[in-house]
C-alpha cells in the first residue's frame, strides 16, 4: 500500500488538496465529541503533525477510534482539505481509519510536558516527543551536511578502527578490550596481566580518536576525513561529557595551522547554514522553546569573520579582566570554560581561534614552535559553549617527534607505523577534531550532551 508522507503534504500542498490520500503514523493526541473527533498524527517524516477529522457517519469503527490511546499506530484514508482560518493549513477528512497497532493507556508519553531528566529514563520512547523529534532530525541533517561539505571538496572518507593498540591523546583514559577471564587472567612473572595470551596477542582498547590512522591516509590521498564513534573512560559526570561520542576529524597534507583554521571555519559555517536552510521548522522550535537567542547567535556566526588570538595574548586579556574567575588565570594552565566564554562573549563577541598553546598542556603529535615552549595548536571557541573544535599542525619532523614522545614516556614500539610517516615522504600536515555532539548542542541550544545522542553512555549509565 502506498502512503503519502506528511512532509510531502507540507512541502507540496497544492499537489494533494482535494485528493484522496492515505497516511500512516502515530497518534499524538485524540479528542472527540459525540459525533466527530480530531487526531493529531505524526508519521516521522516531518516535525509538524497532520490533523485528521473523523466523523461517526463516515466510520463504522468510530467508537473504537475515539477511544484510541496516545501512541497508537494507525492508517488513515481521506480527502485533504485546506483550512485557511485554522491553526493548521489543512486537515484530512477521514473516510476510513485502520488500527495498525493500539497503545495501552499506561503509555508514558501523555499529553503534558515531561522533564528531560525523565525522558532520559525512557530513551527508547523520547524520539516521539516534539523536542527529541527535532533534535534527532537535526542530528541526521548535520551528519549529512558534514559528509556533503567534505565530499564537495574532494576529501576521501576513511573508516578508522574502533579497536586500537595506540592512544592518540596519550592520556590513558581508555576502555580496555579483552577476552581474558577477568577473574583469573594469565600473568607474567612480575605479576602483571599477560596480554600476549589475549585475542589480539596484545593490549587493546576502544579508540579515543581516529586521528593517527587518519594521518596515514592523508599521506596518500592528501585530504581525508574520518567520522565515527570514539570512547573516553573519563570519570566526568557533567553536561558536556559522555563516554561514547562521535568525532569528525579531517587531515590535510601540504598544509599548516592557517589552512587548518580556514577549513574549520568554512566547515562550521557550512553545516550551520545547511541546518538553517533545511530544518526551518525545527530551528524555529528550538528558538521558541529552548533558547530564544539561538537564531540570532547562529546567524551572527555565519556572517562573521572569526577572531584570532594567541594563547599568550588570551592570558594577558583574562588577567586584566574585571571579572573574577573560579579557576586561576596563569600562563601554563589550560583555559577553562569560564575563560573561553569570557573571550567569546565579552571581549570578541563572536567565535575566536586561540592558537599557540604551551606544549605541556597539549598532545605529543603537535608541531613545536620556534620558541620551544609552545605548539602550533588551535582551539575554536564559540559564544555560549566555549571550545567546539580542537586542532593543530602535526609534527612532521622525526627527531622532534621522537624527542617529544620520550619526554612523555610513550613507547616508541607502539607507534612505529606512525613514526614511519616521518621517514617516508613526510610533509607539513594539519587537522582538527569536531565533537559532533557538542556541535549539535550548539546548533540546537540543547544544554546536555545526554539529550543529543540517542542512547547516551555516561558514568554509571549504559542502559538500552
UniProtKB/Swiss-Prot annotation:
Listed GO biological process terms: asparaginyl-tRNA aminoacylation
Record field: catalytic activity: tRNA(Asn) + L-asparagine + ATP = L-asparaginyl-tRNA(Asn) + AMP + diphosphate + H(+)
NCBIfam families registered for this protein in UniProt: asnS, PRK03932.1
Protein's name according to its UniProt entry: Asparagine--tRNA ligase
Family stated for the protein in its record: Belongs to the class-II aminoacyl-tRNA synthetase family.
Subunit-structure text: Homodimer.
Annotated compartments: Cytoplasm
HAMAP family named among the record's database cross-references: Asn_tRNA_synth (MF_00534)
Pfam families per UniProt: tRNA-synt_2 (PF00152), tRNA_anti-codon (PF01336)
Keywords attached to this entry: Aminoacyl-tRNA synthetase, ATP-binding, Cytoplasm, Ligase, Nucleotide-binding, Protein biosynthesis
EC number(s) reported in the record: 6.1.1.22
Signal peptide: none
Entry's Gene Ontology molecular function annotations: asparagine-tRNA ligase activity; ATP binding; catalytic activity, acting on a protein; nucleic acid binding; transferase activity
InterPro entries, alphabetized: Aa-tRNA-synt_II (IPR004364), aa-tRNA-synth_II (IPR006195), aa-tRNA-synth_II/BPL/LPL (IPR045864), Asn-tRNA-ligase (IPR004522), Asp/Asn-tRNA-synth_IIb (IPR002312), NA-bd_OB-fold (IPR012340), NA-bd_OB_tRNA (IPR004365)
Gene name tied to this protein: asnS
